[in-house]
């Protein structure tokens, strides 16, 4: 009887490992919104970390969050480091590439509660009625990340935050309340 239980458990574990191994190794979350403002103003808002508090969907989750900025605003190599409560954790963003006023790339590192590194890209396209801001986050999933993806859909987990952030960016830009 014990032998059958052990064999059944081994089969179950092997099936779970096989299922996790077949999960996608990458993820991508993307949202966009047209904002009635110039690409330059919007580029400055997303590439200058000092301005993120005006529109970031996470800025108000921890009023006591400690933030540190390094480097010149909107310059490659500038960083934004935060340490906060359980809702925001600890992490760092580094501006890695810019193509003013149409694109900003950011290395996003989560340090706590778990470590991961992803890329965020803001693409800006001139359209009738304003500028389309496209916010993309993509990354690699290791075995544990693939296992977590069985229970958590990255698009459903992060997508609504991107939608809130873009809506706040739109309100701040169109309402003239973005910091200079």
Language model feature labels by segment:
Residues 32-36, 81-83, 94, 105-107, ...:
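Generic structural detector for well-ordered beta-strands
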Residues 28-30, 88-93, 115-121:
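Short, surface-exposed coil-to-beta transition loops
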Residues 26, 101-103, 128-132:
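A generic structural signal for beta-strand entry/edge sites
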Residues 39, 43-52, 77, 92, ...:
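Extracytoplasmic/secreted envelope proteins and their assembly/folding machinery
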Residues 96, 107-163, 169-171:
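Beta-strand/loop substructures that line and gate deep hydrophobic ligand-binding cavities in soluble
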Residues 67, 170-180:
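Short, highly charged C-terminal tails/helix-capping segments
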């Amino acid at each position: 009887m014990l032998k059958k239980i052990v064999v059944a458990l081994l089969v179950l574990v092997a099936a779970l490992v096989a299922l996790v191994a077949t999960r996608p190794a990458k993820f991508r979350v993307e949202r966009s919104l047209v904002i009635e403002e110039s690409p330059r103003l919007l580029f400055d808002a997303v590439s200058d970390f000092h301005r993120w508090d005006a529109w970031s969907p996470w800025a108000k989750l921890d009023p006591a969050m400690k933030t540190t900025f390094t480097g010149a605003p909107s310059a490659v190599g500038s960083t934004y480091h935060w340490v906060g409560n359980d809702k925001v954790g600890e992490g760092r963003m580094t501006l890695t590439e810019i193509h003013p006023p149409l694109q900003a790339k950011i290395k996003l590192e989560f340090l706590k509660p778990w470590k991961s590194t992803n890329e965020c890209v803001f693409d800006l396209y001139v359209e009738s009625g304003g500028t389309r801001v496209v916010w993309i986050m993509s990354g690699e999933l290791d075995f544990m990340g693939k296992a977590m993806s069985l229970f958590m859909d990255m698009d459903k987990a992060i997508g609504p935050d991107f939608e809130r952030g873009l809506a706040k960016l739109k309100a701040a830009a169109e309402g003239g309340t973005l910091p200079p």
